[in-house]
Regions:
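An N-terminal domain-start capping segment
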Residues: 2-7, 59-63, 247-256
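N-terminal hydrophobic targeting/anchoring segments and the immediately downstream early-domain regions
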Residues: 2-22, 142-150, 156, 162, ...
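Detector for Asparagine
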Residues: 4, 16, 38, 97, ...
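Histidine/acidic residue-rich metal-binding segments in metalloenzymes
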Residues: 13-121, 125-143
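Glycine-rich, acidic/polar active-site loops that bind/position phosphate-bearing ligands
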Residues: 146-278
């Protein structure tokens, strides 16, 4: 199919598309973090001793003892199961600019052949996937490809809702069997730790004594571009590289006035509302 015919077909598909129905958004206070196992939910679900320990781990990076990890895992599982979740996944961010996951189930069989749900602290803290599919700088042979996911308690677990079900997502880091970082989060956590150490040292030199843990924060990019899927599927550069590699040069003058401060098109507004609800 020629490029012109493909474009004409895309335009026809867009023209014939039925409008998307939009549900009235719920109150923000009702839906905010409803699928997140944050500190507020931990405080409600855990004993005072366990909550104090996990809160200290979240704020200072203090190691969590196995007994407390078991308590946190049990509370996390009960909360997730109560929301219809049967599976959990350690999610991490390898150096491929995409996410990676290792899925497991809460369901195990007992001696009577029945099914029960179980989730221990050891399952929460560490997983054992294969690391051979991820970039490694060619520093090891295939037989040394073992990698480990490790729970990052500084990021709250959350439930990913899809049309095919729900999964408890456990934010994790990914390292090699020798301890090297194999993801993008370990360097970030190490950078935050170094920044916190240096900043606290400066504050103490300035006479400050009551210093909390310092963290960095960043905001999402506010400018984005929406491309209709019919057009995107006809562009190999967008599909493979995620960017425009060929095409007409953009307008550099004031030829258009609908990009800044323009009225929001209906389809764009539908997208924005759906995205914000999620």
């Amino acid at each position: 199919m020629s490029a012109n015919a493909s474009r004409q077909q895309a335009i026809q598909s867009i023209t014939n598309r039925e409008p998307t129905a939009v549900e009235k958004p719920e109150l923000l206070g009702k839906i905010w973090a409803e699928d997140v196992f944050n500190l507020a939910r931990m405080e409600w679900a855990l004993s005072k001793t366990a909550f104090k320990a996990i809160k200290k781990t979240v704020h200072t990076g203090e190691p969590l003892d196995p007994a407390t990890a078991d308590v946190v895992a049990a509370a996390m599982k009960e909360w997730a199961v109560s929301r219809g979740v049967k599976f959990f996944s350690h999610i991490f961010y390898p150096m491929t600019n995409i996410t990676a996951e290792k899925h497991d189930g809460f369901i195990i069989t007992n001696s009577d052949g029945g099914a029960i749900t179980d989730f221990s602290g050891s399952l929460l803290i560490k997983g054992e996937p294969d690391g051979s599919s991820f970039p490694n700088g060619s520093l090891r042979m295939t037989n040394a490809a073992r990698g480990y996911t490790a729970w990052d308690p500084t990021s709250p677990a959350y439930i990913m809702q899809t049309d095919n079900g729900a999964t408890l997502m456990i934010p994790s880091v990914f390292r090699s069997w020798t301890g090297e970082a194999r993801d993008k989060k370990i360097p970030l956590l190490r950078s935050n730790a170094a920044m916190n150490k240096a900043a606290q040292r400066v504050l103490r030199l300035m006479g400050e004594t009551d210093i909390a843990t310092l963290n960095s924060s960043c905001g999402a990019e506010q400018e984005y571009f929406l491309v209709d899927s019919n057009f995107a599927n006809a562009r190999p550069d967008l599909l493979l590289a995620g960017r425009t590699l060929f095409g007409a040069p953009p307008a550099k003058g004031q030829e258009f006035d609908d990009h800044y401060f323009g009225a929001i098109p209906t389809r764009v507004q539908v997208f924005m509302q759906d995205y914000e609800d999620q």
